[in-house]
Amino acid sequence: ISSRKASNPVIQSMNDKYHVDFSGMSIDELNKFIDKMKDEDQTRASGNLLNNTQLAWLAAAQIARDKGYECAALMVEFSVYNIDYSESVTDSSTPLLDKLNTTTVFNNYKNKVLNSGLKDFSGGSWSFTIQKSDNADLFYALHRVSTSGTGFMIGNSIMYYLITVHDTFDFAYDNNYDDLFTTTVNNWAWLCQQTHVLNPIEINLSTAIG
């Protein structure tokens, strides 16, 4: 199984900046790379270099991608680089929104919004939780999300809503990720102790329903 280049242009740009390229590496080779980072276990971050644990996490993200967990991989990569993540329905690539739209929980939410008749909404009653049974990849990227929206009217009727789905990805705080990596990363016991290089990031997904 060959690794694929990052599909997100922000991540590809950061990979180029820090001279990171896992394309063409098999999962076995990626695991050996993580082992090498553990054995060296030294900080070498400076200028255009990342430290060993950051590189190990990026390799783990690539393993997740190769196993079909694109959304989870992206969140880890953005977390390593400490960049907030956003998607808009107008973007050329919307992996989180694409998977979110396939879930029953989000389709139920959309029906709730459309039936509400509200011009604007936000707050706790408009939150929902992604379960692993909804979509395993999405479960590792989003958890309990909050939403807000604005309805746009033609005449006296609301024709569509623009909504924002928000979450915070905080790997060090959440413990839902173990079963994703325990079966794919050989040195997970070491890697899961290195969450200090992962940064909490904000996730904002913007879309329209109607």
Cite the ranges covered by each PLM segment.
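Acidic, glycine-rich flexible loop segments
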Residues: 129-177
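Membrane-inserting hydrophobic helices used for pore formation or membrane fusion
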Residues: 1-148
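Active-site or metal-binding loop neighborhoods of secreted/extracellular toxin and effector enzymes
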Residues: 166-210
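Generic structural signal for short, flexible, solvent-exposed coil/loop and linker residues
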Residues: 11, 158-160, 192
